[in-house]
Amino acid sequence: MARGKANDGDGNWKKFIWNSEKKELLGRTGGSWFKILLFYVIFYGCLAGIFIGTIQVMLLTVSEFEPKYQDRVAPPGLTQVPQVQKTEISFTVNDPKSYDPYVKNLEGFLNKYSAGEQTDNIVFQDCGDIPTDYKERGPYNDAQGQKKVCKFKREWLENCSGLQDNTFGYKDGKPCILVKLNRIIGFKPKAPENESLPSDLAGKYNPYLIPVHCVAKRDEDADKIGMVEYYGMGGYPGFALQYYPYYGRLLQPQYLQPLVAVQFTNLTYDVEVRVECKEYGQNIQYSDKDRFQGRFDIKFDIKSS
């Protein structure tokens, strides 16, 4: 009796999967399956069409050349090269392997600043050797083609150019870092007022320059930094205004950010030294929540052996 019930159960589910009498698969005939599949193809096709149409309409309102809304964009951050984890540079003076990653990072970044990479006069423009005013190059949504960019001579970085010393001072315990301002389309940094500058910078004021200055992050490190040398355009320790505004990757794909090289020539060995570098300008802001907004700090740990 039990075996008969089991056989009936087996027959029921087999019949549900394929009913040979009614020619039904899973309770539906071939015509029914065709109709329901056709319905879902049309249904999801319409959904996809609505989605694609919405995206296309949205893209019509978005410029490919510049962001539509920039009123909430924070001023660009200040960063350094070499790019290091935990913003720490640690090496041993007489061990080339310990500072080789920093040297390679610097050399790789500076390759595009070499004279041989800036020979195309259709793209690159000589904007002078001293800071001057902004270089306006027309509208930001210009579809006429690429806009020119200012050349930046690697030689301006002097001891930190890697041309005379291919270790950028690291083999002598005098490390160099490169300071740069991140790119934001249309941003025009405004030079600071002279009276707002630290005393070390007041005598080097230039109305067309965003100066950069590095000091001890902690009071106890003030006597461990030693002399700091700055190298930039025309010997000025800052970013010249003629490199701004930036027009974006489509219009200025070979844009070169102005650089300031900072060399620490007499850091104390075998102790950790924290340094803070800041840029100064009327529209430069600082934030405790973002340690790279207008400034950054970096730790040096140079071992004598």
UniProtKB/Swiss-Prot annotation:
Subcellular localization: Cell membrane
Q: How does it sit in the membrane?
A: Single-pass type II membrane protein
**GO biological process terms, semicolon-separated:** intracellular potassium ion homeostasis; intracellular sodium ion homeostasis; potassium ion import across plasma membrane; sodium ion export across plasma membrane
Question: Residues on the Cytoplasmic side?
Answer: 1-35
Q: Where are the annotated glycans?
A: N159, N194, N266
| Keyword Zinc (UniProt) | no
Q: Where does the UniProt entry say this protein principally localizes?
A: membrane
Keyword Ion transport assigned to the entry: answer is: yes
Could you state a single Gene Ontology molecular function term?
Answer: ATPase activator activity
Keywords per UniProt: Cell membrane, Disulfide bond, Glycoprotein, Ion transport, Membrane, Potassium, Potassium transport, Signal-anchor, Sodium, Sodium transport, Sodium/potassium transport, Transmembrane, Transmembrane helix, Transport
Cystine crosslinks: C127-C150, C160-C176, C214-C277
Extracellular topological domain = 64-305
Segments passing through the bilayer: 36-63
This protein's GO cellular component annotations are: sodium:potassium-exchanging ATPase complex
Query: What InterPro entries does the record tag this protein with?
Result: Na/K_ATPase_sub_beta, Na/K_ATPase_sub_beta_sf
Q: Which PANTHER family match?
A: SODIUM/POTASSIUM-DEPENDENT ATPASE BETA SUBUNIT, SODIUM_POTASSIUM-TRANSPORTING ATPASE SUBUNIT BETA-1
Q: How does it assemble?
A: The sodium/potassium-transporting ATPase is composed of a catalytic alpha subunit, an auxiliary non-catalytic beta subunit and an additional regulatory subunit.
Question: What does the UniProt function comment say about this protein?
Answer: This is the non-catalytic component of the active enzyme, which catalyzes the hydrolysis of ATP coupled with the exchange of Na(+) and K(+) ions across the plasma membrane. The beta subunit regulates, through assembly of alpha/beta heterodimers, the number of sodium pumps transported to the plasma membrane.
What's this protein's family per the entry? Belongs to the X(+)/potassium ATPases subunit beta family.
Q: Can you name this protein?
A: Sodium/potassium-transporting ATPase subunit beta-1
**Organism per entry:** Gallus gallus
Please spell out the taxonomic lineage of the organism that makes this protein: Eukaryota, Metazoa, Chordata, Craniata, Vertebrata
